[in-house]
């Protein structure tokens, strides 16, 4: 749009940086590789129900055609307690960049997600140079509880997903009394809780396939285009001086 287009009553906007939605950009050629999904879980316990739930999610995602990697948080330092060059930090960041979608699984402890879960997310930056490790990627959230069903952890993770500029899918899973939902071999028993996990993983793969090839377009923002144009104009002005 040009600035002299009087048919638009938007005096506060830079019309040169406004873009009408382009349906063709929302339907690019589809990638043929398997969806890449990263799973994070928030416990270091030997018998960890969030880890067991993460493994069930992995099996389902692989059935639905995804390539899945599960990050082991053992050895990950607390945020700011080690340099970003720490091997576990680098592993986590590289996996986040690799992924096209993520699953976050946390126990609920004292009405919140665990510190182990939060530490993993805190180590992932919003941007590293021109790379944004999570922006535009899909996210599914799940939690386990030792008592009655609760949604505090998944609600918190949804807020974090928004701050990380992710596309959090509508469905979610909260497994109550998790110690009753797994057998002696660590496999989840048939139940409505398991059915919900299936629903969530199926939905995540669908949303990932739907958005991964146009995520850059979906997150292309007017304010950032305006800022980039101003920076470019400033550089050109400096060169001409």
Curated annotation (Swiss-Prot):
What EC number(s) are associated with this protein in UniProt?
1.-.-.-
Chain's role: Has NADPH-dependent FMN reductase activity. No activity with NADH. May play a role in resistance to heavy metal toxicity.
Q: Which residues bind FMN?
A: 43-50
**Cofactor(s) in the UniProt record:** FMN
* pH note: Optimum pH is between 6.5-7.5.
Disulfide bridge map: none
Q: Which SUPFAM superfamilies match?
A: Flavoproteins
Q: What happens when the gene is disrupted?
A: Sensitive to low levels of AsO4(3-) and to a lesser degree to As(5+).
The record's annotation in InterPro entries points to:
Arsenate-R_ArsH, Flavoprotein-like_sf, FMN_Rdtase-like_dom
Question: What UniProt keywords are attached to this protein's entry?
Answer: Flavoprotein, FMN, NADP, Nucleotide-binding, Oxidoreductase
| Lineage, uppermost ranks | Bacteria, Pseudomonadati, Pseudomonadota, Alphaproteobacteria, Hyphomicrobiales
In Swiss-Prot or TrEMBL terms, this protein is called NADPH-dependent FMN reductase ArsH
Q: How does it assemble?
A: Homotetramer.
Q: Which major enzyme category is it?
A: oxidoreductase
Q: Which Pfam families does the protein's record reference?
A: FMN_red
Similarity field: Belongs to the ArsH family.
Please cite one Gene Ontology biological process associated with this protein: response to metal ion
One Gene Ontology MF term: FMN binding
